[in-house]
C-alpha cells in the first residue's frame, strides 16, 4: 500500500511540473508579444511593416506555393495541380526570400553589383513562345553620332509598302465608332528605325532616322484599326527634336511625350485607349515569327510597374497577348514589366487605366513584316474592343430595366 501511494505522489509531482512550465511559457510569450508590439508601434512610420511590405513578399512567392497552401486545407485543389506542380522546392524558395537570388534568373546573381545592370531588370509577366530571361525586349539610347548625322532613307522600300497597302482590298467594317476617335497612337522614341529602311546601314546602333522610323508602324496600326471600324488618331510629334532644343538627354523622352498625351485626353472626351509604339533593339531571330508560312515582326507588351494603373493596364495587355497566342501563335513575345531604379517605369500609363506600350519588331524587320504585325495586332485589339462594347451595352440595358 505504501509503494502505491509513493507512485501516485510521483505522478502528481511530474504533472505539476509540466503545468508550471506551461504557465511559464505562456507568460513569457505574452511578454514577448507586448514587447514586439511596443517596438513596432514606436518605430517611425516609414520603418513599420505595411501592407505594401507584405505585398512585396507575397509577390516574390511563386503561384504554386499558394496553390499548395490551399491544397493543405482543401484536398480538392490537388486534382487541378499538374504533375509538375505537385511539389515545390522549399530550399529554392528559402534562398530567394533570404537573398533575393533566383536560380532561374541569372541576373539576380550580379544585378546589385554591376553599375547600370538594373536597366535590364525587366520582369516577364507572361512569356510568349521561346521567351526567357536571355532574350527579353531591350532598349538602348542612340549613340551621339547618330544624332549628329542623318542616315539616308530607303525611299523605294517605303514607297513600295505604301503602294501595296493602298491597293489592298478592304471590306467595309461590320461595326464602327463613327466619327469618334477612341484610340490615340503616339511615339515617345519617334526616331527608332529599322535597318531595311536605311540605305547601306548594317550597324543596329545606327537604326535611327527622323522620318523613316517607327511612326510608319504607327500609321500602319492606325489604318488597320480604322479598317476594323475603330477610330484612331496617329500623333507624330517629334519628341527627339524637342529634347534636342531643350538640351535634354534621351532618358527624358517620357517627360516630353507626357504633355502630348495629356492634351489628347483633355481635348477628346471619346478617347478610350492610348498606345505608345516602339521598336525593340534585338536582332531578327528573336523578333520574327513565321505564321502559316508568312514572316511577321513579333510584338511585345510593356507595362509600367511604377504606374498606379499597373493592374488595369496589365489586364488589358494580358488579354491581348492571350488573343494573339490563340489567333497568331508566336506573334507575341509576351508581357513584360519595367520599374527598376533609374528606369522610367511609368511610361505615361498613370494618365489612364487603358494605356499600352507596344514594341513592333526589331532593328532587322522590314516593312512587309511590320505591316503583317500591325494588321494582326489591330485584329486582336478590335476583337477585344468590340467584345467589351457588347458587355457595356448589355450592362447599360440591364440598368435601364
From Swiss-Prot:
Composition-biased stretches (Basic and acidic residues): 146-160, 168-179
Cell inner membrane in keyword set: no
One BP term from GO: sporulation resulting in formation of a cellular spore
Span list, region Disordered: 131-179
Stored InterPro entries: Spore_II_P
One family name in Pfam for this protein: SpoIIP
This protein's UniProt keywords: Sporulation
Disulfide bridge map: none
SUPFAM superfamilies: Zn-dependent exopeptidases
Presence of the UniProt keyword GTP-binding in the record: no
UniProt superkingdom: Bacteria
UniProt protein name: Stage II sporulation protein P
Species name: Bacillus subtilis (strain 168)
Lineage: Bacteria, Bacillati, Bacillota, Bacilli, Bacillales
